[in-house]
Amino acid sequence: MESFTRAELVAQRDGVWAVCGEVFEAYEKCRMEKGSDPELCLRESTAVVGCSQKVMREIVKNCQKELNESVKCIEENNMRTIPCEEENKAFNECFDKLVAPKFL
């Protein structure tokens, strides 16, 4: 399993949520219904990791340049994304064009 920095996760969050939102919601629902024992929601947790990893691999494969620019800006601004609108816009456009269609 690949590992990502905090800034990479922040930069990718909207794209990952757009594709994996239903999986995330199923996991949260399970946690609310069954409590905090991780084994009770293992299937849902595995689905979250699997979906997220698939999306992030496609982002790295297709939008690496835009991701790097967004991450650099986020890191330079103490993990704040507001000053990085231009970089985030370029990343989101790449995601919408090259990554999202693979999951529709």
UniProtKB/Swiss-Prot annotation:
What biological-process GO terms show up in the record?
mitochondrial electron transport, NADH to ubiquinone; negative regulation of DNA-templated transcription
Q: How does it sit in the membrane?
A: Peripheral membrane protein
Place the motif Cx9C motif 1 on the sequence: 20-30
Which Cys pairs are S-S linked?
20-51, 30-41, 63-94, 73-84
| Chief localisation class | mitochondrion
InterPro entries per the UniProt record, alphabetical: Ig-like_dom_sf, NDUFA8
Keyword entries, A-Z: Disulfide bond, Electron transport, Membrane, Mitochondrion, Mitochondrion inner membrane, Repeat, Respiratory chain, Transport
Q: Where is this motif: Cx9C motif 4?
A: 84-94
GO CC aspect terms:
mitochondrial inner membrane; mitochondrial intermembrane space; respiratory chain complex I
Which stretch carries the motif Cx9C motif 2?
41-51
Short motif (Cx9C motif 3): ranges: 63-73
Compartmental location: Mitochondrion inner membrane; Mitochondrion intermembrane space
Q: Where is the CHCH domain?
A: 17-59, 60-102
| PANTHER family for the chain | NADH DEHYDROGENASE [UBIQUINONE] 1 ALPHA SUBCOMPLEX SUBUNIT 8, NADH-UBIQUINONE OXIDOREDUCTASE
Subunit composition? Answer: Complex I is composed of about 45 different subunits.
Which protein family is named in the record?
Answer: Belongs to the complex I NDUFA8 subunit family.
Task: Report the protein's function.
Answer: Accessory subunit of the mitochondrial membrane respiratory chain NADH dehydrogenase (Complex I), that is believed not to be involved in catalysis. Complex I functions in the transfer of electrons from NADH to the respiratory chain. The immediate electron acceptor for the enzyme is believed to be ubiquinone.
Q: What is this protein called?
A: NADH dehydrogenase [ubiquinone] 1 alpha subcomplex subunit 8
Q: Which organism is it from?
A: Dictyostelium discoideum
